[in-house]
Regions:
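Anaerobic metallocofactor- and corrinoid-dependent redox/one-carbon enzyme cores
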Residues: 1-178
Length: 178
C-alpha cells in the first residue's frame, strides 16, 4: 500500500503476536514479509513467549506458518472448521482473529468479508473505502456481529492494532478457560 511503509506493519505485528504466545498462520503479502524477516525460520522461536517457544520446539516448527497466496484463505477456514469440529465449539468461540494490516487491494476486503462471515473477528490497519457512509461503517464494525458473531476492527496504529488483536484472543481464551 503506497500510504504506508511496506512490510513494517506485517513484521511488527507478527513479532508482537509471537512474543505474546500467539502462533501466526498467514498467506499472501504477509507471508512474503515474514519470510524476508526470517519469521518463518525455526530460529524465530527465540522471539516467542515461553509458551509458544516450547510448542515450536516440541513440534519442530517456526512460530509463523505459511498457507499460500492471499486468495488461499479457504485453507485457513478449513483449519478453523477442523478446530471447531474437534473442539465442539462454534468457530466464533475459538481464539482466532484475521488481520490485513497493510491491505492494498479490494480483494483483501472481499477475503476479510469471508473471514468475518465465518465468525472470525478481522482487524484492518488501513481504512476500508466505506468511511463516506456512517451506516456502512456501523454495519461492518458493529452491526454484523449480531448475524455472524464477528466484525471488523480498524486501527491504523500497528501497536494498538496488535493490542486489540491480543485482547480479543485473550477474551476468547478466558471464556474457554484456557
Amino acid at each position: 500500500n503506497p500510504r504506508i511503509r511496506p512490510d513494517y506493519g506485517h513484521i511488527q505485528l507478527m513479532k508482537k503476536l509471537i512474543a505474546n504466545d500467539i502462533i501466526v498462520i498467514l498467506s499472501g503479502c504477509s507471508a512474503q514479509a515474514a519470510a524476508r524477516a526470517g519469521l518463518m525460520d525455526k530460529r524465530a522461536k527465540d522471539l516467542c513467549g515461553a509458551g509458544l517457544k516450547r510448542v515450536c520446539e516440541l513440534a519442530d516448527i517456526p512460530p509463523v506458518l505459511h498457507m499460500g497466496s492471499c486468495v488461499d484463505i479457504s485453507r485457513m477456514m478449513v483449519l478453523a472448521s477442523e478446530l471447531s469440529k474437534d473442539s465442539g465449539l462454534n468457530i466464533s468461540q475459538l481464539p482466532l482473529v484475521g488481520c490485513a494490516p497493510e491491505w492494498m487491494s479490494e480483494k483483501a476486503i472481499s477475503i476479510g468479508n469471508y473471514v468475518v462471515a465465518t465468525g472470525i473477528d478481522t482487524f484492518l490497519g488501513v481504512d476500508p473505502q466505506v468511511s463516506g457512509s456512517s451506516e456502512m461503517t456501523y454495519w461492518l464494525t458493529e452491526g454484523i456481529r449480531d448475524w455472524v458473531e464477528a466484525a471488523y476492527t480498524v486501527e491504523k496504529d500497528i501497536e494498538k492494532l496488535g493490542d486489540a488483536m491480543i485482547a480479543r484472543i485473550e477474551e476468547k481464551r478466558a471464556a474457554l478457560g484456557i
